[in-house]
């Protein structure tokens, strides 16, 4: 009977959760279903129909039929809702799987990163140890090199006195008489050793870059959380499924209403012809919506429907329900549209979370690959540490050897400067000896000259006294003059030429030698 089938046009559920209730559901009456705990929204109720109620015009019934037919185009929206619900389930499963995999990878990578940081600290300890020795070595180098440079500067500022050099020669310093190439060679060798010691820096920097890049990937990875206050994915999924179920139920109600309209037309005289004509007109102007009124009428005529009224009272009640439900068709269609709009928006949120999870998983795969590359290079970093230690011992020994050479050069140059001062003193001493010898010979010459003068006087007296008595041929030397004596220096081995050294030069040399002896 019609009364038994005219339950309600709108059977939409308000949703599994209060957060997804439909905005129009407040206008509907709610009643409990014995087979479900979910509430029913916006259902139609009707009272017993008066058999004597006024009849409804055929035009009105046909209009209701056409509107009901047009409302069935909501099927595409319901299919889309079902598609979204299925995709949301798959997306939710994917998010859960991706989040679990990304979380597992992240924890493993963080553990490995911690180990890498410990290894890096160990390498840093070796580097710091070498750096401390290196600083001590540099200080020693600066001290020795500074002393050597100071000594060379002193030689550069010390001019060689002209008394030691040929006349007309350009003024020269003590530094001009030594080969500076030895000093430069030692310095270059030390620089090379220092560069060898600093080569470990590059390995540490590369290791730091590897760890920093790995951490950046992890840091840039979107955070995944199961806290529904941040990502209520399960709540959204429930809402989408609830929307889809309600939309399907609403579509069932629309279909039921359409079937009742067809039954009402079919049981009204002249209704079928008018309905077919009006449907054809609508099809010509608005296009085919995929629902054939003729086909439904033929199906109902070949198969007795539960909607078929058995009495006039049943038919009157059916018409009453049709009229009541017809007033709600547009609202039901609008509700389906609004629910689909809400589903599309919620699905975008789920898709965003899916994309975030996918990106997080992709980042973790990238981080895992980077970790593998670091693992391949880790042996090189550890080998670099061992190589650094061995090279440090060798190069340090080489540097200390060069430092000893520089110290020896410094001492040699200092002795060279002191020897020059000693040379000045020696030249002055020799000149003093020459002066003393000359004084002695000058005094001796005076005494000899006096003796010779006395000898000449005695010879003259002798000639005057006895010269006329002695024949000249008795002694050939009787008429000879006195012998002359002259002291002259030997030309060989003469070592002091030119003017004497200035007193200030000699005193300066003595003062410097005195300072050296007091050290």
Swiss-Prot record:
**What does the entry give for GO biological process?**
autophagosome assembly; autophagy of mitochondrion; piecemeal microautophagy of the nucleus; protein transport
Alphabetic keyword roster: Autophagy, Coiled coil, Cytoplasm, Membrane, Protein transport, Transport
What Pfam family is a match for this entry?
ATG17_like
What is the documented disruption phenotype for this protein? Does not significantly decrease the growth rate under nutrient-rich conditions.
Show the ranges annotated as biased composition (Low complexity).
12-42
| Region (Disordered), start-end ranges | 1-50
Q: Where in the cell is it found?
A: Cytoplasm; Preautophagosomal structure membrane
Keyword Protein transport present in the record's keywords: the answer is yes
| Positions in coiled-coil regions | 324-355
Q: Does the keyword Cytoplasm apply?
A: yes
Q: Which GO terms describe its cellular component?
A: Atg1/ULK1 kinase complex; phagophore assembly site membrane
Task: Give the family, as the similarity comment puts it.
Answer: Belongs to the ATG17 family.
Recorded hits in PANTHER family, A to Z, give:
AUTOPHAGY-RELATED PROTEIN 17
- Give the quaternary structure: Forms a complex with ATG13, ATG29 and CIS1/ATG31. The ATG17-ATG29-ATG31 complex interacts with the ATG1-ATG13 complex. Forms a complex with SNX4 and ATG20. Interacts with ATG11.
**What is this protein's function?**
Autophagy-specific protein that functions with ATG13, ATG29, and CIS1/ATG31 in response to autophagy-inducing signals as a scaffold to recruit other ATG proteins to organize pre-autophagosomal structure (PAS) formation. Modulates the timing and magnitude of the autophagy response, such as the size of the sequestering vesicles, through interacting with and regulating ATG1 kinase activity. Plays particularly a role in pexophagy and nucleophagy. With ATG13, is required for ATG1 activation by autophosphorylation. Recruits ATG9 to the pre-autophagosomal structure.
Q: What is this protein called?
A: Autophagy-related protein 17
| Highest classification ranks of the organism | Eukaryota, Fungi, Dikarya, Ascomycota, Pezizomycotina
């Amino acid at each position: 009977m019609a009364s038994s089938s005219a339950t309600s046009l709108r059977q939409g559920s308000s949703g599994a959760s209060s957060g997804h209730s439909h905005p129009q559901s407040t206008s509907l009456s709610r009643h409990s279903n014995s087979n479900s705990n979910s509430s029913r929204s916006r259902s139609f109720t009707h009272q017993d129909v008066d058999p004597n109620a006024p009849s409804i015009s055929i035009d009105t019934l046909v209009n209701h039929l056409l509107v009901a037919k047009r409302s069935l185009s909501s099927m595409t929206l319901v299919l889309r809702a079902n598609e979204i619900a299925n995709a949301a389930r798959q997306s939710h499963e994917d998010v859960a799987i991706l989040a679990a995999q990304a979380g597992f990878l992240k924890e493993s990578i963080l553990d490995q990163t911690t180990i890498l940081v410990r290894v890096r600290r160990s390498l840093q300890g070796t580097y710091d140890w070498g750096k401390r020795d290196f600083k001590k070595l540099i200080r020693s180098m600066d001290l020795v090199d500074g002393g050597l440079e100071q000594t060379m500067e002193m030689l550069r500022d010390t001019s060689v006195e002209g008394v030691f050099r040929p006349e007309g020669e350009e003024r020269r310093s003590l530094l001009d008489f030594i080969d500076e190439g030895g000093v430069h060679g030692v310095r270059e060798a030390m620089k090379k050793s220092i560069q060898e010691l600093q080569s470990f820096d590059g390995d540490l920097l590369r290791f730091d870059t590897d760890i920093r890049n790995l951490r950046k990937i992890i840091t840039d990875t979107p955070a995944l959380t199961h806290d529904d206050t941040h990502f209520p994915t399960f709540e959204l999924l429930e809402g989408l499924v609830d929307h889809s179920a309600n939309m399907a139920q609403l579509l069932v109600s629309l279909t039921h209403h359409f079937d009742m309209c067809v039954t009402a037309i079919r049981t009204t005289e002249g209704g079928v012809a008018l309905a077919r004509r009006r449907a054809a007109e609508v099809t010509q102007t608005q296009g085919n919506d995929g629902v054939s009124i003729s086909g439904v009428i033929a199906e109902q005529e070949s198969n007795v429907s539960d909607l078929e009224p058995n009495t006039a009272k049943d038919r009157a009640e059916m018409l009453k329900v049709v009229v009541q439900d017809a007033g709600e068709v547009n609202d039901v269609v609008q509700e389906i549209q609004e629910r689909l709009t809400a589903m599309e928006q919620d699905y975008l949120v789920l898709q965003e979370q899916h994309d975030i999870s996918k990106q997080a998983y992709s980042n973790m795969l990238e981080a895992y690959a980077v970790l593998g590359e670091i693992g391949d290079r880790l042996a090189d970093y550890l080998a670099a540490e061992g190589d650094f230690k061995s090279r440090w011992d060798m190069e340090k020994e080489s540097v200390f050897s060069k430092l000893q050479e520089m110290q020896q050069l410094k001492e040699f140059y200092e002795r060279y400067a002191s020897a020059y001062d000693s040379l000045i003193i020696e030249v002055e001493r020799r000149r003093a000896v020459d002066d003393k010898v000359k004084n002695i010979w000058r005094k001796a010459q005076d005494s000899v000259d006096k003796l010779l003068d006395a000898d000449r006087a005695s010879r003259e007296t002798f000639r005057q006294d006895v010269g006329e008595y002695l024949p000249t041929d008795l002694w050939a030397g009787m008429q000879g003059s006195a012998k002359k004596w002259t002291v002259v220096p030997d030309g060989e081995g003469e070592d002091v030429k030119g003017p004497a050294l200035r007193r200030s030069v000699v005193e300066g040399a003595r003062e410097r030698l005195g300072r050296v002896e007091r050290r």
